[in-house]
């Protein structure tokens, strides 16, 4: 499955870990490059640094191909 997770906090990171473990293709979107770098170092996932509400970021993450899209950000 193609999974996009927006937000690399505690819950987002755990979901990235679980989906990655199951062999799914995971893309993480986070506005903080430190979080993207850390998660990319720990898991075999692609990271897009940017806002999950920005159309260019969503295009780069190929959101149109997602089977699952999870937004885990707080406002």
Regions found by a protein language model. Give the residues of each.
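Cytosolic regulatory regions of ion transport systems
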Residues: 1-73
